[in-house]
Amino acid sequence: GQDTAIVHLSANDGEAIENEIIYGSVSGLKSDEDGKALGGAVIGIFKTGTEEFTKENAIQTTTSADDGSFSFEKVPYGTWVIREIESPTGFVLSEEEIAVTVGKVDEVVEIELVNYFIKGNIELTKVDADYPDNKLTGAVFEVYADTNGNGEFDKDDKLCGEMTELEGGVYQMTELRYGKYFVREKTAPDGFVLDESVYGVSIEENGKTYTVENKAGVGFINDAQKGSLKIVKTSSDGKVEGFSFRVTSADGYDQTFKTDKNGEIFIEGLRIGEYPVSEVSDSASAGYILPADKQATVKTDSTTIVEMHNEFRDTPKTGDDFNLGLWVSLAAASVIGAGVLGFVGFKKKKKED
């Protein structure tokens, strides 16, 4: 066969040759959707192909500073993935995966990571306190941000705007950022009492709608504005007790009341509005001419007075009818008697002649 030639090479003065790993670095800036620096984000650098982005699986981890800056030092040669592990409070975890490649010694790769605010919605349903199935429209609600975060409504809190009224007495404000808010009723629906209290609500989960109530399990209730009605009864013969009066309204109110010994009826807690008042035709009012119906306007926190007068019917009594007949009979008898006596006297005188 052929002989193989052996060549001896000598390099580096006979010392072993070592390959040094190339290292670079990654630096970045963390900001929110408004472009403001964002600290407190935990960020990791991972091997490509990683499926679970946890601290345990990361090659390195770091936390963004208050000025939003972060960096990874001594990143080995190759391609890596940068991914957020924990978001700052109030922000949605970023699932963006940014690939970075270190290809030469001391190379610095710069990146930017953005976090978006947690945003939620607030909603309330306006309800009639007396009739919960009756949903109220026409209210105006203001929403304030708890700017100083003290949990108390004060002059420093910022007005975010007014809630939008949807159909069916539902009011809503959407896309509110993470934090605490206050809801205050600015204008009550017509005929209802304004709720002057302020109600707090916190946005904590992204995409969630939070319900504001002033009565748990019912909704945001309003009491109706109310007043009183007084009916005063008079009559030509002085009788006033026990007469019945009917009071109605367009919203379904329909009640009948009787006058007391003073001829009065006092009704409290009537919703403001128009109430027709009519006297009931019954045994108590049978001998009287009933008065015309009257319209009573009930106003907030006041008493409306309605006066109703009865005239007694002027009809002859049974005893008077008897006496009149008796007198007529007696008068007729007298006339007849006088005629008979005159006739007898006339005949007697003629006979004497």
Which sequence ranges carry the predicted segments?
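Solvent-exposed loop/turn and edge beta-strand elements of beta-rich ligand-binding domains
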Residues: 1-353
